Amino acid sequence: MYQVVAFLICACCLCACNNEVPQKSAEKSALVVPTKKKDGQALDAKLHPDLVDIQQSHSQIQIELKYTTSANFLGEKLYSKIDKAYLQKDVAARLARVQKALQQTHPGYQLLIYDALRPVTVQQKMWDALDSLRPVERAKFVSNPKNLSLHNMGAALDLTILDAKGNPLDMGAGFDDIRHIAYPIYEDSFLRTGQLTPLQVQNRKLLRSAMQAQGFRQLPTEWWHYNACSREEAKSKYKVFYTENDIFTTPTSN
């Protein structure tokens, strides 16, 4: 009997200890949140004057930055400071007009941004990760850092559309899918073979028509990628951001 009583007492003590753990963890987490918010505000204050947070251009535009987590083709977090989608101000203004027009034709629909401004250092990591592909094939998916990408200047973005219920439209291939089925140039062929459905192609065309109406150019090998202009034009008018620090360092006047 004494052994049973002792066992019950020990069990109760263990349960009591276990019940205290979540409470302490919750208290610790609650203290971390304000610090992160404060850090984010500090970075916003240092944002390069050429850039703008996309959601400041239009509050209905949503973001889900794929490279702030490990849920991407590299399987690792690539951004340490970036947690918002940044674009050149004139590019963001055009994107806001895309969202406005989309709402008029499809009430409740919203743009969802997967990536926008991307430093050259991150571009290099992506390029190196695909070293199993020949450079010609690799360049169809990731621009060679030596040539620069419009992402590196805040003049390109990766995106899709959310329906009125907040679900991404079915595009027949996921973001960062390197298979040919993700290539816009092969849509008609895959439609004929049944590998893409009419609805999937229709969804792609909806995004394409909305973006092209504001002068954005789709990459022929990625249904989600749009450039604001040509590479040559971008190089002539926009700053190149080589690191995340470049994005959050306000230039000093001479």
Functional labels for PLM-detected ranges:
Residues L14-A16:
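C-terminal motif of bacterial Sec signal peptides marking the signal peptidase cleavage site
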Residues V120-V122, M126, Y226-E233:
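Beta-rich nucleic-acid/ligand-interaction surfaces
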Residues N18-A116, A129, L133-T221, S230-N254:
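Extracytoplasmic cell-surface/polysaccharide-interacting catalytic and binding patches
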Residues V4-C12:
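Sec-dependent N-terminal signal peptides
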